[in-house]
């Protein structure tokens, strides 16, 4: 690989933001884009009811509800680093899609609400990051409101999320008494001013905590700060880059995203310390980003990003080599050679054609139904990247068509939406009712809305008497026997795999006991 290409890889930072709904993820996303020059004006959360909606929330239903339902990709440049930010669905129902986004990043930013502390969605997402040893930085948001004691928050993060905290900045007061933060490593006092552009009144470089200017600026709050820092030095962990990169320690910043305060300090540390593109595990070997041959995997399919064109785009994470427009690659699953002429990069709704891209970059490739989640593009090697699963759904609905003449359109719509991976579809071995399965119930609303607006299909749901699903594999003869005996509970999923839908956990356990020669899987790697 050329020196130039190596430098390009080292400049890349690819990450996602994880948080509980309403912790401020959309706001901090926009402020990062603002610093990166990718947008000129932040679509403030408070202005959501007006015509301007958050740049990263572009689907119609998201605009109506003020939540991020889809995951989009945004690219910006900051201090000569190329940053790829993958926006994850913020609503707690969208964990499956969020999980797959986390397979495509090298690090994550965790946003914690200073008022509410650690919440359930954050715990789930951090568990996913922990499986992959993903390095995590933390931003404690909403310091401009009356929140919880920062020591209490640090303690909660360590105990609940089981990760060491290394405070990088420390708040001076909060709510009405919020004066700013003190940077423990640069010894800078960052003054908060809600009226100032980007929330920062001034940054004062101090010789240390005994600098007399501290008292001049902060008055009685200077003594509070000195007391806090003294406590921290005894109790908190100092920042260790090795522990951070291993996913064992999280550097913690405090601020107020809506006021753009504290975001720059976070971003500076992020580009300097977050990992460049990391090696990726494939079935046969580990793939280094510095290898010459191109390799990439699809982690997301998004249909109808442009309502005018009814298109579908597959999002690919480049793992090695260099992408150039027009290059021919092997679509491994299909054993077919394809030329990529129309790859795009994203800035929320805006797309631009890409002439070249490097490991860590996310490119979008137009897709007419041939690309599936987990597919690999290579220069010929039979590679299959691991760790991009489907999860067994926990909620099920029967789909009833209101117009019987639309059955073909229904099949097309359900199949395409399932290929995006937020819901799964199951066709019965016996009977006509399609079943939609989802990890979270909000996805059913999304499917109904999109069937009507994108496929012109009106349908209703009826409850389906199922509680869980498992994919079933085993010897051909045994599978045939199983399908005969359990025909009313056997379905074929959107990729042609046999699935068993059970009405209760007891029923599933009982069936598994009766069919010990078969394997029942709660997750399934994309084929």
Curated annotation (Swiss-Prot):
One matching Pfam family is EF-G_D2
Any single Gene Ontology cellular-component annotation:
cytosol
Q: Where does GTP bind?
A: 19-26, 87-91, 141-144
- Write out the annotated subcellular location: Cytoplasm
UniProt keyword annotations, A-Z: Cytoplasm, GTP-binding, Nucleotide-binding, Protein biosynthesis
**Top-rank taxon, per record:** Bacteria
Instruction: Show the CDD domains listed in the entry.
Output: RF3, RF3_II, RF3_III
Transmembrane residue ranges = none
**All copies of domain tr-type G, residue ranges:** 10-278
By sequence similarity, the record places it as follows: Belongs to the TRAFAC class translation factor GTPase superfamily. Classic translation factor GTPase family. PrfC subfamily.
Its biological function? Increases the formation of ribosomal termination complexes and stimulates activities of RF-1 and RF-2. It binds guanine nucleotides and has strong preference for UGA stop codons. It may interact directly with the ribosome. The stimulation of RF-1 and RF-2 is significantly reduced by GTP and GDP, but not by GMP.
| The name this protein goes by in its record | Peptide chain release factor 3
């Amino acid at each position: 690989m050329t020196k130039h290409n190596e430098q390009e890889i080292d400049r890349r930072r690819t990450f996602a933001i994880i948080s509980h709904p309403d912790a401020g993820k959309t706001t901090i996303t926009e402020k990062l884009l603002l610093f990166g020059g990718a947008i000129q004006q932040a679509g403030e959360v408070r202005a959501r009811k007006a015509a301007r909606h958050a740049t990263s929330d572009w689907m119609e239903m998201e605009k109506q509800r003020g939540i991020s339902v889809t995951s989009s990709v945004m690219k910006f440049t900051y201090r000569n680093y190329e940053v790829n930010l993958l926006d994850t669905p913020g609503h707690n129902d969208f964990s499956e899609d969020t999980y797959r986004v986390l397979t495509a990043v090298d690090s994550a930013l965790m946003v914690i609400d200073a008022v509410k502390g650690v919440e359930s969605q954050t715990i789930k997402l951090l568990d996913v990051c922990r499986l992959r040893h993903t390095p995590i930085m933390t931003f404690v948001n909403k310091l401009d409101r009356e929140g919880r004691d920062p020591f209490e928050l640090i303690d909660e993060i360590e105990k609940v999320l089981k990760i060491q905290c290394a405070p990088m900045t420390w708040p001076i007061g909060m709510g009405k008494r919020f004066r700013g933060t003190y940077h423990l490593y640069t010894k800078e006092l960052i003054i908060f001013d809600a009226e100032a552009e980007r929330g920062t009144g001034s940054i004062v470089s101090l010789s240390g905590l005994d600098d007399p200017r501290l008292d001049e600026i902060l008055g009685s709050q200077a003594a509070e700060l000195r007391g806090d820092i003294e406590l921290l030095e005894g109790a908190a962990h100092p920042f260790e880059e090795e522990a951070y990169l291993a996913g064992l320690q999280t550097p913690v910043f405090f601020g107020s995203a809506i006021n753009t305060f504290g975001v720059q300090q976070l971003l500076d540390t992020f580009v300097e310390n977050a990992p460049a593109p990391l090696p990726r595990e494939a079935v046969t070997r580990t793939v280094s980003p510095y290898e010459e041959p191109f390799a990439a995997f699809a982690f997301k399919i998004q249909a109808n990003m442009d309502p005018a064109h009814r298109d579908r785009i597959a999002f690919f994470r480049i793992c090695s080599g260099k992408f150039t427009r027009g290059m021919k690659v092997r679509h491994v699953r299909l054993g077919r050679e394809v030329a990529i002429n129309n790859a795009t990069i994203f800035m929320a709704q805006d797309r631009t054609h890409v002439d070249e891209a490097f490991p860590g970059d996310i490119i979008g490739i137009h897709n007419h139904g041939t690309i599936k989640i987990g597919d690999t593009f290579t220069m010929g090697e039979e590679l299959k990247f691991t760790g991009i699963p489907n999860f067994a759904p926990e909620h099920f609905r029967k789909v009833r068509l209101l117009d019987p003449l639309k059955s073909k359109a229904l099949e097309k719509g359900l199949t395409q939406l399932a290929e995006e991976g937020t819901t799964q579809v199951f066709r019965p071995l016996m009977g006509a009712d399609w079943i939609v399965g989802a990890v979270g119930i909000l996805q059913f609303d999304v499917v109904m809305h999109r069937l009507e607006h994108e496929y012109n299909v009106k349908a209703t749901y009826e409850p389906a008497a199922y509680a869980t699903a498992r994919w079933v594999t085993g010897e051909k003869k045994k599978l045939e026997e199983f399908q005969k005996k359990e025909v009313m509970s056997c379905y074929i999923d959107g990729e042609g795999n046999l699935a068993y839908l059970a009405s209760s956990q007891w029923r599933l356990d009982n069936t598994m006991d009766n069919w010990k020669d078969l394997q029942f899987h709660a997750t399934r790697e994309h084929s």
